[in-house]
UniProtKB/Swiss-Prot annotation:
This is Holliday junction branch migration complex subunit RuvA. The RuvA-RuvB-RuvC complex processes Holliday junction (HJ) DNA during genetic recombination and DNA repair, while the RuvA-RuvB complex plays an important role in the rescue of blocked DNA replication forks via replication fork reversal (RFR). RuvA specifically binds to HJ cruciform DNA, conferring on it an open structure. The RuvB hexamer acts as an ATP-dependent pump, pulling dsDNA into and through the RuvAB complex. HJ branch migration allows RuvC to scan DNA until it finds its consensus sequence, where it cleaves and resolves the cruciform DNA. Residues 149-199 are annotated as: Domain III. It comes from Legionella pneumophila subsp. pneumophila (strain Philadelphia 1 / ATCC 33152 / DSM 7513). One of its GO terms (molecular function) is four-way junction helicase activity. Keywords: Cytoplasm, DNA damage, DNA recombination, DNA repair, DNA-binding. GO terms for cellular component: cytoplasm; Holliday junction helicase complex; Holliday junction resolvase complex. It is found in: Cytoplasm. Signal peptide: none annotated. Residues 1-65 are annotated as: Domain I. One of its GO terms (biological process) is DNA repair. Homotetramer. Forms an RuvA(8)-RuvB(12)-Holliday junction (HJ) complex. HJ DNA is sandwiched between 2 RuvA tetramers; dsDNA enters through RuvA and exits via RuvB. An RuvB hexamer assembles on each DNA strand where it exits the tetramer. Each RuvB hexamer is contacted by two RuvA subunits (via domain III) on 2 adjacent RuvB subunits; this complex drives branch migration. In the full resolvosome a probable DNA-RuvA(4)-RuvB(12)-RuvC(2) complex forms which resolves the HJ.
Length: 199
């Protein structure tokens, strides 16, 4: 199993997906938006903690800058009814620290505001992750509280919303309601998701 990859980003155009060149071999890697927007554009080397899923027709690689985020991903996919895609959506819609707080506080209502999470799934997450979440107490660093190094455009934020399943028109409409200012793409996405979930 692949647990770590270190190389250069050669393709980073679609939010949540990138190609990592490791010694001349290009690996397709899926990431959470938290990780994706912390990786700066360019040819600088980057290391990713990898979770590998082997299927009959595919080898799927999920990459994380932070080892704790990978551990949280692994805990999520152990929950009945939560697959890798939904786990990535959760980690893209809320910071690991905020998610852990929801579980500690048994705040299933807030979890239902995340894309793809219904009432039953939210309650299942709270019940099944109460014990496993203890390993993260104090371990999820401020990495995910930091903004990405550079300001990203509204277009990138809209592309990310589309990747999460929202229609382009809907994404544009909600983005126009947000004061762009000097906010990072990640901040724009968070605010957009808050608006969309409050409807």
């Amino acid at each position: 199993m692949i647990g770590w990859l270190h190389g250069q980003i050669i393709d980073k155009h679609q939010p949540g997906k990138l190609v990592l060149d490791v010694n001349g071999v290009g690996y397709d890697v899926e990431t959470s938006l938290n990780t994706f927007f912390q990786i700066e554009n360019g040819n600088q080397p980057v290391g990713l903690h990898i979770h590998t899923i082997v299927r009959e027709d595919a080898l799927l690689l999920y990459g994380f800058l932070d080892k704790e985020e990978r551990s949280l991903f692994r805990s999520l996919i152990k929950v009945n009814g939560v697959g890798p895609k939904l786990a990535m959506t959760v980690l893209s819609s809320i910071s690991p620290k905020e998610f852990i707080q929801c579980i500690h506080q048994e705040n299933a209502a807030l979890l239902t505001k995340l894309p793809g999470i219904g009432k039953k799934t939210a309650e299942r997450l709270v019940v099944e992750m109460r014990d496993s979440i203890k390993q993260f107490d104090g371990s999820v660093s401020d990495t995910f509280q930091k903004q990405a190094g550079s300001t990203h455009s509204q277009q990138e934020a809209i592309s990310a919303l589309e990747a999460l399943g929202y229609k382009p028109q809907e994404a544009w409409k909600v983005m126009n309601k947000i004061d762009n200012g000097n906010k990072s793409c990640e901040q724009l996405i968070r605010e957009a998701l808050q608006i969309l979930s409050s409807r």
